């Protein structure tokens, strides 16, 4: 039975989020082999940008369906692309394409985005090593258009922006990066 004091103790969450989480836990506990529940929860996590939790649930979907639920592969590829994990994104896309029937335009588009993002990320790294700061900043921006949640690429763009004299861009990136670091010490070491 859910008691009101539990809701009052939750400072960082409102009551509806707590109720949603409890309902999800109860649903999954009551039917742990229902892959649809895991898929729905994974898509909810994805919409909340909780990528590790979403990936975990998509993995569970694939485990329960013997990797036959191809949409889970596509969703994993999208998450990996947003995080800048190019190899994992390509692997998930290959799994999706090998399991899906027919040609999927959204998978083809994601494939080209992953290819473009990976190439831009590589170009940004080369430009940074060559101290071509503006080229690095532009290439990192292109990579971030695909990998919008990549801390590594955003840090790289911030460093290149600082070196190029674009303080405003660097501050924007560092403002995004800082909340994603676990400790202040890690942020200061950047």
Q: What residues fall within each predicted segment?
A:
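Alpha-helical tetratricopeptide repeat
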Residues: 1-190
């Amino acid at each position: 039975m859910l008691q009101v004091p539990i809701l009052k103790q939750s400072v960082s969450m409102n009551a509806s989020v707590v109720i949603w989480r409890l309902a999800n836990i109860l649903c999954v506990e009551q039917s742990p082999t229902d892959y649809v529940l895991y898929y729905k929860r994974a898509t909810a996590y994805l919409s909340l940008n909780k990528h590790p939790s979403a990936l975990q649930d998509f993995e569970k979907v694939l485990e329960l369906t013997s990797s036959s639920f191809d949409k889970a592969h596509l969703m994993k590829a999208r998450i990996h692309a947003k995080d800048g994990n190019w190899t994992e994104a390509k692997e998930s896309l290959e799994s999706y394409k090998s399991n899906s029937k027919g040609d999927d335009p959204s998978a083809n588009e994601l494939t080209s985005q992953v290819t473009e993002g990976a190439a831009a990320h590589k170009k940004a790294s080369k430009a940074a090593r060559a101290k071509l700061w503006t080229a690095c900043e532009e290439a990192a921006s292109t990579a971030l258009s695909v990998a919008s949640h990549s801390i590594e690429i955003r840090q790289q763009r911030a460093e290149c922006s600082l070196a190029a004299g674009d303080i405003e861009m660097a501050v924007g990136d560092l403002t995004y990066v800082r909340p994603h670091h676990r400790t202040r010490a890690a942020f200061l070491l950047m």
